[in-house]
């Protein structure tokens, strides 16, 4: 495939790795949309690096050779024309003119490619000179900077509180007359439209996963052959302690941009500032020694921490330096939102056109896009924003232009209409009771009509809010003047979501409680300091194509707890631009089945041609005899396992589950990880097992751990879990960890070797079928994909979650583990399991059969280990 058989690799690759790289190379060469599955532990990241970077460098040489060949062909044609029209000067010149123009164009493209190579050489020379101390003013500049910083530190030592960091002047707060053609970009750099060589954008969910990629790249043969640029947020890159102290992302972005504006003031502006009683400063790290930092980034592979450390030494901003490095970078590392969110992508200067996009850990890509573009706003958000807006208009009414007054009035009108949907008025307080408000579901066009905002041009209003930086100015106003007549805090009780969801099902429903918690957690994350940020995001959803989303109106028991939620139903609508512009796209993951989801709901729905889509799936590197999978249909006393909604609180079933765990703990060595369907069910089970004494019996063999509720406690629990296994003293043989499907431990964590000798999945974690959001999603798929798409989505939601849990074990070729699926329904779902699990999967109608199979498996492994 692609005519390539050999790939540079740090060691002899496994056959499946070579196969992966060949298929990846072909995908990029042919400009395809690839879905690649390689089980975790098979060296997927290294295969991606070596396959993709070989293609990247080959393509660069191919591009240059094709330009030279095309130029040579044209020059040959010109010679032939001269011979053909010898003596006829006019005819020869006429034909040659077009060809000469083509030659000039080809030469310009070739020169542009050479120019980048020359720039990298110059960067290397600059880094060398800098490191050797040959830049004349280096010490003087650093000493000058230190003196300046010491003076600033001394002056500000008495005023270090976060709330006093940002010194806003009234001139900063007043809305200016907007130029319709003004450029809203943060950067003033002139981007050359030269021929650019192809870049690879590598995208993953978290910065830790991107750091892992960098670690693998450093071990690869391409460590010194490519320029890599890791992109991150200001939160990760900012080295200005005053800005970082703000913690909140919106506030950090706001203050950073304000400091940039102050550093770009004209002489006229400076005279005005000097007359002001309020002090103003620009960021001391801008522009700084950016050229050297850019050179450092582009000439050596560095992760985020390395770049931050170097930038602190150079006293220059790493955030803006990495952004400026994108132009000459070959491999650009970006988190999900920087690529998948169009506004973020454009603000960073990321251009996907004719470039390659590789998205790793893409198994939840559809859900990630939906979450990224789904927005909730609370009654408290609306009331506080309305309150800030009213105060702001009153404060500056004498200096606001007529246009600005009009737009502010339109925004105020919208906010009043939105709070009306939640049973409030502009004079309401968050803890007031709502009046005449009901739970409702709307299409986008219906919502605007029902909310009575259909007469407002939402596009113009959002453009005004964005270009005028109104949210920043309201935040600045609140910081300086405080919220006079500030809205009262809502009641602590959060019943807005619960009342809505409980009306759908019994009040004691564990699934409903999980759904309530999910919505409450989402809303709690919204920052109240400047609520217009999230309200603007909500208003932007109204620009979505009507059929692609729904809006839920959910009044609370108090107005502040009610919420409006936009749910994106069609993630392809935010991926279509990428599909159209990118040269090739690769979605990679450990468990990508069912691949039909990505084909139907992402690529085809985004307008891709079917023939452009390719798939690749490889087996696990772990030998067949190192994996055992049992579908357990009943327990020790014959009670059938079916953990559906009706049976989940069945005490006989809970007792049987407890007896099963006791028996399995007796025969399985080291670590066991148990995945349960939900947090509420985990609590129910643990309480029941404590009450009937079964938990104590489990504790005789295994030290018991539970998934922590706080993410900050995860590492501590895992460390203790690991220590308990390593230091187990008889009669104990290890530890057992109770976890939750889709929780903090079901993705991204490894339970290799003794940490995960058995993964047990209890029940089938179907999403709550009573959820209105789920119902709307299924209905949308049925109407827009095919008649079975909704029910298939429901089934896939369950099995994808199960497969993620299974993938936590068996992380390298010499590892071994077992998987026990506790529910009789799994017998009919075997084809939805990963291929490497299917090959050893057996259905065990009776408990004794499973016990014997597990006992034989571990006896064989014990014997094998003792013989080594």
What are the language-model segments listed below?
Residues 305-329, 340-349, 468-636, 714-745:
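A contiguous, basic/glycine-rich beta-loop/short-helix subdomain that forms a polymer-engagement track
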Residues 576-577, 638-677:
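Conserved interdomain hinge at the start of the Helicase C-terminal
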Residues 677-708:
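Conserved helicase motor "Helicase C" RecA-like lobe of SF1/SF2 P-loop NTPases
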């Amino acid at each position: 495939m692609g005519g390539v058989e050999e790939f540079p690799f740090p060691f002899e690759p496994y056959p499946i790795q070579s196969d992966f790289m060949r298929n990846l190379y072909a995908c990029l060469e042919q400009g395809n949309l690839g879905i690649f599955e390689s089980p975790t532990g098979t060296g997927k990241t290294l295969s991606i690096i070596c396959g993709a970077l070989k293609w990247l460098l080959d393509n660069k040489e191919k591009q240059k050779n094709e330009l030279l060949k095309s130029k040579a062909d044209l020059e040959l044609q010109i010679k032939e024309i001269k011979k053909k029209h010898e003596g006829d000067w006019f005819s020869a010149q006429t034909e040659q003119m077009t060809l000469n123009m083509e030659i000039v164009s080809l030469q310009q493209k070739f020169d542009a490619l050479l120019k980048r190579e020359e720039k990298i050489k110059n960067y290397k020379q600059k880094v060398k000179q800098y490191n050797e101390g040959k830049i004349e003013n280096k010490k003087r500049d650093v000493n000058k900077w230190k003196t300046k910083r010491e003076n600033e530190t001394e002056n500000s030592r008495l005023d270090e509180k976060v709330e006093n960091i940002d010194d806003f002047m009234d001139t900063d707060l007043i809305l200016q007359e907007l130029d319709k053609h003004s450029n809203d970009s943060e950067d003033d750099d002139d981007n050359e439209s030269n021929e650019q060589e192809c870049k690879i954008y590598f995208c993953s969910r978290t910065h830790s996963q991107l750091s892992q990629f960098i670690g693998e790249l450093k071990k690869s043969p391409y460590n010194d052959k490519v320029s890599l640029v890791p992109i991150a947020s200001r939160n990760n890159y900012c080295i200005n302690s005053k800005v970082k102290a703000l913690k909140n992302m919106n506030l950090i972005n706001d203050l950073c941009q304000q400091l940039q504006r102050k550093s770009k003031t004209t002489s006229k502006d400076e005279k005005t500032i000097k007359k002001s009683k309020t002090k103003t400063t620009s960021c001391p790290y801008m522009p700084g020694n950016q050229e050297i930092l850019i050179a450092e980034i582009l000439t050596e592979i560095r992760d985020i921490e390395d770049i931050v450390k170097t930038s602190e030494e150079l006293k220059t901003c790493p955030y803006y330096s990495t952004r400026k490095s994108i132009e000459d970078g070959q491999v650009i590392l970006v988190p999900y939102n920087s690529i998948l969110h169009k506004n973020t992508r454009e603000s960073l200067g990321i251009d996907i056109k004719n470039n390659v996009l590789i998205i790793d850990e893409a198994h939840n890509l559809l859900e990630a896009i939906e979450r990224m573009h789904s927005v909730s706003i609370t009654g408290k958000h609306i009331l506080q924003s309305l309150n800030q807006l009213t105060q702001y208009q009153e404060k500056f009414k004498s200096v606001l232009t007529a246009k600005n007054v009009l737009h502010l009035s339109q925004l105020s009108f919208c906010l009043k209409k939105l709070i009306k949907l939640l049973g409030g008025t502009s004079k309401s307080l968050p803890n007031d009771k709502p009046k005449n408000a009901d739970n409702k579901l709307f299409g986008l066009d219906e919502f605007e009509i029902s909310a009575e905002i259909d007469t407002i041009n939402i596009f113009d209003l959002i453009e005004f809010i964005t270009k005028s930086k109104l949210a920043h100015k309201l935040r600045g106003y609140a910081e300086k003047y405080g919220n006079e007549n500030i809205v009262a805090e809502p009641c602590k009780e959060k019943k807005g979501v619960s009342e809505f969801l409980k009306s759908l099902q019994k009040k004691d429903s564990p699934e409903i409680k999980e759904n309530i918690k999910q919505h409450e957690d989402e809303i709690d994350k919204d920052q109240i300091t400047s609520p217009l940020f999230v309200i603007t995001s909500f208003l932007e959803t109204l620009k979505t194509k009507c059929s692609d989303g729904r809006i839920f109106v959910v009044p609370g028991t108090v107005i502040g707890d009610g919420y409006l939620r936009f749910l994106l139903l069609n993630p392809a609508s935010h991926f279509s631009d990428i599909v159209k512009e990118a040269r090739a796209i690769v979605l990679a993951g450990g468990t990508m089945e069912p691949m039909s989801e990505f084909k139907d709901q992402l690529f085809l729905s985004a307008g891709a041609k079917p023939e452009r889509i390719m798939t690749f799936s490889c087996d696990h590197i772990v030998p067949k005899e190192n994996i055992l999978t049992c579908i357990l249909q009943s327990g020790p006393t014959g009670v059938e396992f079916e953990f559906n909604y009706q049976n989940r609180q069945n005490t006989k079933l809970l007792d049987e589950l407890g007896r099963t765990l006791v028996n399995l703990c007796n025969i399985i060595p080291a670590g066991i990880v148990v995945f349960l369907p939900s947090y509420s069910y985990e609590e129910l089970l643990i309480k029941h097992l404590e009450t009937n004494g079964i938990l104590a019996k489990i504790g005789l063999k295994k030290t018991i751990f539970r998934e922590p509720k706080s993410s900050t406690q995860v590492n501590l629990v895992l460390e203790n879990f690991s220590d308990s296994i390593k230091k187990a003293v008889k009669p104990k043989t290890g530890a057992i960890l109770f976890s939750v499907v889709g929780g903090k431990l079901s993705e991204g964590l490894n339970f290799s070797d003794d940490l995960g000798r058995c993964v047990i999945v209890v029940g089938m974690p179907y999403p709550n079928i009573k959820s209105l959001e789920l119902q709307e999603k299924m209905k949308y798929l049925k109407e827009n994909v095919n008649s079975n798409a909704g029910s298939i989505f429901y089934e896939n939601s369950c099995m994808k979650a199960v497969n993620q849990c299974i993938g936590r074990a068996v992380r390298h070729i010499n590892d071994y583990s077992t998987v026990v699926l506790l529910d009789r329904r799994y017998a009919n779902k075997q084809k939805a399991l990963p291929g490497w699990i299917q090959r050893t999967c057996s259905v065990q109608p009776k408990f004794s059969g499973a016990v014997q199979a597990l006992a034989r498996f571990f006896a064989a492994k014990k014997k094998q280990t003792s013989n080594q």
